[in-house]
Amino acid sequence: MEKDIKRQIQILEIITSEEKWFTTIEISKILRCCNKTIMKDISFIKDFLPEDWHIKIKKGKGVRIYLPYNKHRNEITFLLFRESLTFRILQHLFERETKTIATLAERLYIQVPSILPALKRVENYLKKFGLKLRKKPLRLEGDEVRIMIMYLDLYLKSYNDTEWPFEKLKKEVIFQYLGTLEESLGISLHVVSKRHLSFFIAILLKRKQQGYKVQLNRKFLYFNTETPDYVKIGRIFEKLEREFGVSLTVQDKILLTISIKSSKYVYKDINKEKEESVQYFKEGNLSIYELVKDFINSLEEKLKVDLISDEEFIFALVDYFKRTIYHLQYLCMFERPQKQTIQYMQTEHSETFSAVKEVYTEFVKKNEIADYVSVEEIAKVTMYIEASRLRYTSNYKKVLLVTGESESWAEYLAATLAKRFGDKIQISTVFFAKKSDHDVNADFIISTIPLDLGSTPIICINSIPTERDYTNIQYYLDLQDG
């Protein structure tokens, strides 16, 4: 990204951070540039704003931005990012074939000497995805799946929730197919996952129309073809092939199956899903379930603990691998801030964490799944194991637990609360698509996120509960007992 656009985005982040006046000198000190440059950038941003956004500049006070309450600053940062040559070059290469730098410069209305530094920035952007930019002829080079993931990342940070960057591919049609998929698989996709999936499907279809082919070299990926989900998804995408005039290969269908499985969703009938998953696991007829069994056996041997008898743990691991295992090799492309819950597991359950790290790393290498496993994934498996251990020493009553963290942390937190309060509570976890208007069948709710449910008492706690949180829960339980 060009320095001026990057700086303009930073200015926007500063002036939208608080409802107050910011002096240009104050901003220039933060960004370490001259006052004149800041004034020029603010003038550019002012002309760039939508009609219902306003920037006021007052002598002696500075600059202040007024934006509608239902709008987010990202709407402008998206627009600014799309002005960058990095985006425009990659967008052009996505839309049409351009074989020479001279032709690219001409089509973008830029002089050749001016486009060369931008191409260098594009090369640096591509590096984190393991991709290269070839000059003769001009093209992206690398694994086709990585190219699609790169474009997914690019478009997600360039367009807001209501925008659709694929002119010749109808958004309504793709969303209609996603709705059919939800019905067939018995799931409800998170609204963010629907957007991600719709973009990914559009990118895959566009690349297919241009003649690009997906190659999947890891043997275990083909285990997907044995699963019921693959069969259901395949039937639905036969209609998609006719709609968009493409022919999907086995590799394409596997990739689409993986992208759907690894999305964020909840089961419409969790008990039915749990029963079927445990049954498939015990029958041992599907290769992917045999992989999970091998992993659990290795964990048992290393930790000297019985896990195979815990059906809750079996389902948790099967569901975890269903969502995660297929894209482990691509997770390294995305840097994620380390969550507080991960650090907690590393310190509070260091022995289990170390054992899981050793077993998991050996497992992915032996089965040629990935080269390494991130601490986040190690922590998730650690949470499931510790939740299983806690279940064996806890009795339950009933409470609804709502968290904004991962499913694995919800499992661990539920078991921790059950352990803490003995037979006074039974914990059930739930997924909220919204933060209000949800049918709740519980005496009270324990939540780590704000909720608006007037009919049911709510106790808000921290992601990692404090003694004060435990005291509040105990106080409420005592009130109920009284």
UniProtKB/Swiss-Prot annotation:
One GO process term, biological-process aspect: regulation of DNA-templated transcription
Keywords assigned: Activator, Capsule biogenesis/degradation, Plasmid, Repeat, Transcription, Transcription regulation, Virulence
Residues passing through the membrane, by range: none
Listed PROSITE patterns: PRD_2
The PRD domain, residue ranges: 165-270, 283-395
Record-linked InterPro entries: BglG_antiterminators, HTH_Mga_DNA-bd_dom, Mga_HTH, PRD, PRD_sf
Domain of life where this protein originates: Bacteria
Induction (free text): Transcriptionally regulated by AtxA. Transcription is also positively controlled by carbonic acid and CO(2).
Protein family (similarity comment): Belongs to the AtxA/AcpA family.
Function description: AcpB and AcpA regulate cap gene expression and capsule synthesis.
Name of this chain's protein: Capsule synthesis positive regulator AcpB
Naturally occurring in which organism (per UniProt): Bacillus anthracis
